[in-house]
Amino acid sequence: MSPSQVDEALEAMRGLFPETPLQLNEHLSARYGANVYLKREDLTPVRSYKIRGAFNFFRKIVGDSPSGTTFVCASAGNHAQGFAYVCRHFGVQGVV
């Protein structure tokens, strides 16, 4: 992806959930003698970064898919949760 495509994807994603913060972890910082920041992906709606990939896939494909298309996901974990959430966001049928 080009930098402009990354910026476009980030902007589109803000309609689904806010930017996840970087948070200084004082315990780990003290332990390792360096500032250690945690990227708080647990603050996304499905508690995982996997929603990002599902969102970008659907953002690209939904408009080109025939009406009534059912999407299928073979996962039982974080990706499945992101897939289901994004299906609902885009108003498409999904099967996990």
Tell where the protein language model's regions lie, with residue ranges.
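PLP-dependent amino-acid enzyme catalytic core
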Residues: M1-V96
